[in-house]
Curated annotation (Swiss-Prot):
SUPFAM superfamilies: Ribosomal protein L30p/L7e. Belongs to the universal ribosomal protein uL30 family. Keywords: Ribonucleoprotein, Ribosomal protein. The gene is rpmD. Gene3D superfamilies: Ribosomal protein L30, ferredoxin-like fold domain. One of its GO terms (biological process) is translation. One of its GO terms (cellular component) is cytosolic large ribosomal subunit. It comes from Shewanella amazonensis (strain ATCC BAA-1098 / SB2B). GO terms for molecular function: structural constituent of ribosome. InterPro entries: Ribo_uL30_ferredoxin-like_sf, Ribosomal_uL30_bac-type, Ribosomal_uL30_CS, Ribosomal_uL30_ferredoxin-like. Part of the 50S ribosomal subunit. It comes from the Bacteria. This is Large ribosomal subunit protein uL30. PROSITE patterns: RIBOSOMAL_L30.
Length: 59
């Protein structure tokens, strides 16, 4: 079974760069406090690094 991580949106996407909004959508996040469980892959880690200031990651 692949390792998973929990990603929670902690800040609003309003007023952010369009690419950063699209990255949140790509991660499956919709609103503040929303948590998703994703596979721990390099692609997902790269998306998280792009919007690190808006999300919280739990292993």
């Amino acid at each position: 079974m692949a390792k998973t991580i929990k990603v929670t949106q902690t800040k609003s996407a309003i007023g952010r760069l369009p690419k950063h909004k699209a990255t949140l959508t790509g991660l499956g996040l919709r609103r503040i406090g929303h948590t998703v469980e994703l596979e721990d892959t390099p692609a997902v880690r790269g998306m998280i690094n792009k919007v690190y200031y808006m999300v919280k990651v739990e292993d």
